[in-house]
Amino acid sequence: MLKMGVVLFIFLVLFPLATLQLNADQPVERNAENIQDLNPDKRVIKIPVPRRRGPYRRYGNCYCPIG
């Protein structure tokens, strides 16, 4: 009877707790994907555009600062 009680305890208490813990992690992972834009359908390539600062004078192919 003791062996049957241990087996029932494992399958009726411990096993469901382990599976519930795994299911609880899934929404957090989905939220992390949305925050980090890991979804390939919504991913947009962002290329930074260099901005010129201050007064510059063009010399050939180079913009050099004045002063």
From Swiss-Prot:
Keywords: Amidation, Cleavage on pair of basic residues, Disulfide bond, Neurotoxin, Secreted, Signal, Toxin. It comes from the Eukaryota. The keyword Lyase does not apply. Residues 25-50 form a propeptide. Pfam families: Conotoxin. Its main location: secreted. Expressed by the venom duct. One of its GO terms (molecular function) is ion channel inhibitor activity. One of its GO terms (cellular component) is extracellular region. InterPro entries: Conotoxin. The modification Isoleucine amide is found at I66. Residues 1-24 form the signal peptide. It is found in: Secreted. The keyword Disulfide bond applies. Belongs to the conotoxin M superfamily. The cysteine framework is C-C. Homodimer; disulfide-linked. Found in vitro with synthetic peptides. The homodimer-1 (C-62 linked to C-64) causes a reversible hyperactivity (jumping, rapid circling and tail flicking), when intraventricularly injected into the brains of mice. Monomer and homodimer-2 have no activity. This is Conopeptide Vt3.1. It comes from Conus planorbis.
